[in-house]
Structure formats: C-alpha cells, structure tokens
Amino acid sequence: MLDVQSIRKDFPILDHKIYDKPLIYFDNGATTQKPRCVVEKIESGYYNVNANIHRGVHFLSQAATEAHEDARKTVQQFLNARSSNEIIFTRGTTEAINLIASSFTDECMSAGDEVIVSVMEHHSNIVPWQIQAARKGITLKVIPMNEKGELCMDTFRSLFSERTKLVSVTHVSNVLGTINPVKEIIEEAHNHEVPVLIDGAQAVPHLKVDVHDLDAEFYVFSGHKIYGPTGIGVLYGKEEWLDKLPPYQGGGEMIASVSFEKTTFNELPFKFEAGTPDYIGSTALAEALRYVGRLGMDNIAAYEDELLRYATDKLNAIDGMRIFGQAAHKGAVLSFLVGNIHHYDMGMLLDRLGIAVRTGHHCAQPLMQDLGIEGTVRASFSFYNTKEEIDAFAAGIERVRKMF
C-alpha cells in the first residue's frame, strides 16, 4: 500500500500552479518528475565528488569512479542481471537501440537477413533498423495487432524464416499501454535460435523487470522515464553477446591500447562506453532506482493499475469518447479522442486548466496509420497521481467537449 500524499511531498514540482490551477501532471509516459533525493544526488555529485572517472590517481577521481561503478551494480541488481559487465550506460533507450542495430548488423547480418518488429514500435525501434536496411540491405518484418491493440501472436510465429536474425519489440506500447507477452515472444524466438531485443522504456517504471527470468539477449531503458535524469540510459546485454559484438563508437576509455598500426578494445562493459561517461547521471539514476525500490515495484504496479481502471471508467462515461487500446493487460496509459475535437485543441485547452497531457503521434506514426488517425491525446499516470486528479481531468475533458 502506497502513502500517495506522503510520496507527493517528495516531488516539489507537484505543488506548482499552472495558470492559477494546481498542476495535474499526466505526461509521465514522456518523462517523469524527479524526487527530491534524485535532484540532491545530482547536486551533491557536482559539489562533492566531481572529477573525470577511471585512471585518475587522485582522491576525487577515485571517489567518482567508485560511485559510478556502484551505480552500475545498482542497475544490475534492479534488473537481476548476472554481472555488472552486462550493464552498459548509454544516453537513453534510443542510443541503446542504435548501438545494437549498428553492432549487431555489422557482426551478424548480411543483405536479405530479417529483423522482426511490431506495428506498435516507437520510432526509436524502427528508424535504426531502416538505416541498417538502407546501408546493408536487411529487411523488416512487422507483427500486426488485433482490434484490441494486442499483437497477433499466430502471425508473429509465421514470420520466422531461415533469414530471421533478430526480434526487436517493445515491452509496453507507449501509445496503447498494451503489455506485450514478451516472455512468450522470447521463447518463440529462441525456438528458432533467434536473439531478442526488448525496448523496456515504458515497462521499467511500472513493472518489475527480471532480465534473467525473461531471458532476452538485450533489454534497454531510459533513466528519465523512471524518475532519474535525462541523458542517461541502460543497455543490458548477455555477456556472451556483448563480447562478440564490435564497438559502436571509438574514443577514450573503450580502448586497451592504441597505435597507428592497431587498436585493441577494452573489456566489458567499457568497450561500449566511448568518451567521458555521465557519471553524475549514472549515480542519479541509481538513486532513482533505490527510490522506486523502497516503494516496491509490485506496490507501484498495483496502484497504477487501480488508477488506470478508475480513469478508464471515468473517460468512458464521456459522450463521444474513443479510447484506443483495449488490451487485457495494460500499463497506466490512456490514448483517446473525443468526438471531432482535434487532439491538439484538446491538449491546449486542458493545459489552460493546469492539466499536462501529450498530444500527437507519440513517435509512433506507423501505429497511427494502422489506427487510421493522425494522433491522440495521451494521459499517462504515475504513483504520485491521484483519483482526485483523474476526477478533475474528466471534468476538464467534459468542459472542453461542451465548447465544440
């Protein structure tokens, strides 16, 4: 059981007023607000242990290095990875997917080979593969969905061929909220000896993720989606796979030795971390993971599911309401349209009431094309949101509806 009113005190921004209205922040799918402890960790890092990490012999450098590597261990424990060598720090989910798209394609794919994605992917899990398709001639196959917004698993099983080299799918849809059956997807792929990449950007903040249990070869997420700072993300990869893949970028830290004749690369995880790492971001991310860990991921999931069901009932009572995504298993996301009101107009007018939602295609244009629409209004909830806020949200939608 979460003490939501106590939790809200950890997030000073929630006390803000927008246009003289209390802020109702329902844009958590885009980014989450940051608890005071995370902001204080960033401040403390710059004030007390700011130094470039690794190889420094002085005290500050060694202290910063220790904090950074401790953060890596925190991520390892949070995901239940086998080794901290399997945790690569990136700038976010997008860079992590691009890293795998580049390195995996170079090492494991040739013209005519196939990657399976789904119709509900974020652009970050489409465009990197299209770049590789243009560069190397690989092919994308797409898993369709049914009218509820669930992946068509029978069709998925039929997509495999001897040229299929990777499955790359989202754990939770950022538009529909659909929680995909990723364990079943992984098992099916492994039946064909095909590795799997899971985009966990929308899953990690809301669900308990155990990469050892899932058994995916790669799993990626962003810090700012789980109450950490922007500019830091994570690539989890099975050690045997990361060992065989070539580096994504060249530069400092990812090398063992350099001469004009030859460069040898560093060991894991440093082989994939060229340049000065975001050691302040990594420690702040670790602080965010500790924070949600204290709340308990099971508690978070249960409360957010309660919010989702409450909000769904409230919105369904509004005339002209169309909610997109009716999957049996959903995360705390509602995408909708009301009558003929443009999503942008709805979002702008809700903003005047202090309500922050996301409007547009949500970086999922192929999904919008599949739905036959240009965009939606998206409300995405967090454990610091309340039913009272949902009541005000529903009243705000009704107020806007009556204006048109």
Could you tell me what each predicted segment is?
Residues 1-404:
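Pyridoxal 5′-phosphate
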